[in-house]
Amino acid sequence: MSHLAISELLKGKVSVDSQVTVKGWIRTRRDSKAGISFLAVHDGSCFDPIQAVVPNSLNNYDEVTSLTAGCSVSVTGVLVQSAGQGQSYEIQANSVTVLGWVENPDSYPMAAKRHSIEYLREHAHLRPRTNMIGAVTRVRNCLAQAIHRFYHEQGFLWISTPIITASDCEGAGEMFRVSTLDMQNLPLTDKGEVDYSEDFFGKEAFLTVSGQLNGETYASAMSKIYTFGPTFRAENSNTSRHLAEFWMVEPELAFADLEDIAKLAEQMLKYVFKAVLEERRDDMEFFAQRVEKTAITRLEEFVEKDFAQVDYTEAVEILKACGKKFEYAVEWGVDLQSEHERYLAEEHFKAPVVIKNYPRDIKAFYMRQNEDGKTVAAMDIVAPGIGEIIGGSQREERLDILDARLDEMGLNKDDYSWYRDLRKYGTVPHSGFGLGFERLVAYVTGMGNVRDVIAFPRTKGSATY
């Protein structure tokens, strides 16, 4: 490449007095009476821009003094140690080439000032240019790379599971249909129902809600696998924690029980939090200053503390006895709400907590039934400051019990014939969990809404770009 990343220069990886070229966008321009302009140039490789000191002796100095926020430039000059506060290095420029101007700078949506989160959502195609979303993007990348690295080091294989599926993993029916049929002229059966045999796949097809079921097939042969990809839920949930399209990390581990995956989940979270604290300290300091003052300290505490563990039944007893008035009543057999989970993590245990062995009637068909006949080997990991961050279970490996559960939930066994085959041919105990990646990024950065930690959020009524 003919230019260097600004991050390389600011980390001191390039010798002082070297001739360097950087390319990026103008953050700010300041002109002095001494005939010198100071350009803050940013290329997205790190939080801070680098300052270019531009003398009026340049042939195109008039162009330089016309630069505004957002203009793209190529700057060549000598890298020197900076005498000014706030930066370690700067460039004494001997050439500035304007690559792209900003039309109508006064109306530039990302002018150099603070913008509200709501405003940035309305300009999602330009918001990566801001300090906040730029920092979110780098932290998100760091977390994703750390997740892949963790599983690689643990001997897991990354499996790419299908986006288009005919299976409903959760059995909830909140799925997006995929079809090439003419919506204005649908083919009908003799019963007046849509004839999906005429569709592209010859049957109903949907966007996946989870890669888990497909992942189990590979765990049943490769022992340790994980998926990391987009998932889709057609939930009518307009909250700060829900998206219609989001990314999931889903490991599946053969010859493993609930305790094994609870331990794996704890190891993974601590690994990726350490990575972001070490690799993206500059961005995390920004979040601690501008977004969530405990952004760094709570991750450090998370890494140091052992996770607490509690059975669902005991958790209900704790909540009932605590004397706190909740918006939603606490009863055995009812799923815990976010307020209940956060009380347990933030006030009772004051640590991340694994809640396990939930009532079978509120959990999915594939979760292993416990010996009491009332609960399943399921778990949620709840973190202070956000609530549930991971959900997982030991999978039901006994065919007769799985079949009974499918019947009980009104699910067609023929639709799951391939899944049932795994229990017919060398079945083994196996377990896995799902991590909502956007919730993880929101927790790490302190951003209050998952819509602000994914590039182009998809929510009910909103699919712009």
From Swiss-Prot:
GO biological process, one term: asparaginyl-tRNA aminoacylation
Pfam families (UniProt xref): tRNA-synt_2 (PF00152), tRNA_anti-codon (PF01336)
Organism: Pseudoalteromonas translucida (strain TAC 125)
Catalytic activity: tRNA(Asn) + L-asparagine + ATP = L-asparaginyl-tRNA(Asn) + AMP + diphosphate + H(+)
Keywords, sorted A to Z: Aminoacyl-tRNA synthetase, ATP-binding, Cytoplasm, Ligase, Nucleotide-binding, Protein biosynthesis
InterPro entries for this protein: Aa-tRNA-synt_II, aa-tRNA-synth_II, aa-tRNA-synth_II/BPL/LPL, Asn-tRNA-ligase, Asp/Asn-tRNA-synth_IIb, NA-bd_OB-fold, NA-bd_OB_tRNA
Record EC number: 6.1.1.22
Protein name: Asparagine--tRNA ligase
Alphabetical list of PROSITE patterns matching this protein: AA_TRNA_LIGASE_II (PS50862)
Main localization (coarse): cytoplasm
